[in-house]
Curated annotation (Swiss-Prot):
<feature type="domain" description="ATP-grasp">
    <location>
        <begin position="100"/>
        <end position="295"/>
    </location>
</feature>
<keyword id="KW-0963">Cytoplasm</keyword>
<keyword id="KW-0961">Cell wall biogenesis/degradation</keyword>
<dbReference type="InterPro" id="IPR000291">
    <property type="entry name" value="D-Ala_lig_Van_CS"/>
</dbReference>
<keyword id="KW-0464">Manganese</keyword>
<protein>
    <recommendedName>
        <fullName>D-alanine--D-alanine ligase</fullName>
        <ecNumber>6.3.2.4</ecNumber>
    </recommendedName>
</protein>
<feature type="binding site">
    <location>
        <position position="262"/>
    </location>
    <ligand>
        <name>Mg(2+) 1</name>
    </ligand>
</feature>
<dbReference type="Pfam" id="PF07478">
    <property type="entry name" value="Dala_Dala_lig_C"/>
</dbReference>
<feature type="binding site">
    <location>
        <position position="264"/>
    </location>
    <ligand>
        <name>Mg(2+) 2</name>
    </ligand>
</feature>
<dbReference type="GO" id="GO:0005524">
    <property type="term" value="F:ATP binding"/>
</dbReference>
<dbReference type="GO" id="GO:0046872">
    <property type="term" value="F:metal ion binding"/>
</dbReference>
<keyword id="KW-0436">Ligase</keyword>
<dbReference type="GO" id="GO:0009252">
    <property type="term" value="P:peptidoglycan biosynthetic process"/>
</dbReference>
<keyword id="KW-0067">ATP-binding</keyword>
<feature type="binding site">
    <location>
        <begin position="127"/>
        <end position="180"/>
    </location>
    <ligand>
        <name>ATP</name>
    </ligand>
</feature>
<dbReference type="InterPro" id="IPR005905">
    <property type="entry name" value="D_ala_D_ala"/>
</dbReference>
<dbReference type="GO" id="GO:0008360">
    <property type="term" value="P:regulation of cell shape"/>
</dbReference>
Amino acid sequence: MKVLLIAGGWSSERDVSLAGARGIEKALRALGHDVTWFDPATSLDGLLEAASSHDFAFINLHGSPGEDGLVQAMLDTAGCPYQGSGPAGSFLALNKAVSKQLLRRHGILTPDWAFLAARPAADWEPGLGYPLFVKPNTGGSSLCLSRVTQPEGLAPALEAVFAHCGEAIVEPAIPGVEVTCGVLGDTALPPILIRPAEGAFFDYTSKYTPGGATELCPAPLPAEVTAHVQDVTLRAHRLLGLRGYSRADYILRDDGALFLLEVNTLPGMTPTSLVPQEAAAIGLDFPALIARLIELGMTAAGR
């Protein structure tokens, strides 16, 4: 097939997108596909024309315009199949303030939060206690994520978010271990337990620096806890109207309470990223995972 590989973009996660796309291109070519790159570095001009002349689009964008559903809407207009979720599900999952309301309404635990659409007053306090996390309302890869332990650290953390993003989310830090779990098709994958380096948390540096975190797959959890993580992951995937694949990130508290932090509709896709690790645990190497995502995308498009 002629595959349009969409990567890069204008978000703060551009470099991550391009790095992952190189491995995807290699896998696509190994599968026998012809690959053309499309990089919406500053705009989406030309995407409709490019998509119309290709059999499939593989999206590897992070943040806008890929995770917010804009590219998916344009591909739908062009009649070009693609992997993963459609426009509505993509938007719902990317917008933490919206997705957290939906998840909580349906009984899925998620940390309390304060949403900010603009810089607050200098003396603003979220009333959530300390420590807490400050992060962009829309975005991934833990960019601009700050752990704030004292009130005087709140304003600089918010400024770091608003310097790059238009909206912020503030959440209390919940003590526990970090767990992530992917979905492929209609199946939850084996969860991963993440142990950041001593004294750190799983931020952008931990994710993309060798040795920044230890990722244990499958997670060394009791069978009933693993089953619970997988059940909640599938429920969240379906509640948000997602398809193809996704990845849910959690904090598992010592008492067994499982708090869903966010759901990613375009999770990292380097061969050593989290979802590819989980797929490998069930016998799918990286090219086989890419082939499965294409198959799911073609099926969703009725091809």
